[in-house]
Amino acid sequence: MNRFIIDRDPEAIAQQLCDQHICKMVLEEAQMLNTAVRIHAPEFAEEAGLYKIAYENHPCTIWARENSMNYMFGVRLMKAMNDEYVWRYPKRKENGKWVTNTGHKSMRHFDALVDAVEYMPNVSNFMTPHP
């Protein structure tokens, strides 16, 4: 479980990640965000069918749920990494056939994760991640 903050811009971070990380980091970010929602809005998370709590006490997971701005940074990073994943891998194998890559499978919860920002604590001090 990691979040590589190598820039302040989520799009720049995604572009700089190596191929191995771009393939797995979308899922890791999804796990952190899903955990944040499960902690702050368990009923919403259950209705949306979000992933179960994972790595609840990991520093990156704690950071994501501390406030709505941190949470939205994670949402933007997840989207940027997925966009980069699709750009690098426009085709993928499914059932033995090459098909158009429409995104990482963990993106199926993305809209619910965006909507869940309203359940995150609203504090005025964004804890800027430092590269």
How should these model regions be labeled?
Residues 1-49, 59, 96:
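Phosphate/adenylate-binding glycine loop and adjacent helical scaffold
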Residues 36, 74-131:
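Catalytic cores of phosphodiester-bond-cleaving enzymes
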Residues 52-53, 70-73:
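Secondary-structure capping and boundary motifs in well-ordered enzyme cores
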Residues 54-62:
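Histidine-centered catalytic micro-motifs
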Residues 63-68:
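Short active-site loop/helix that positions an aromatic residue
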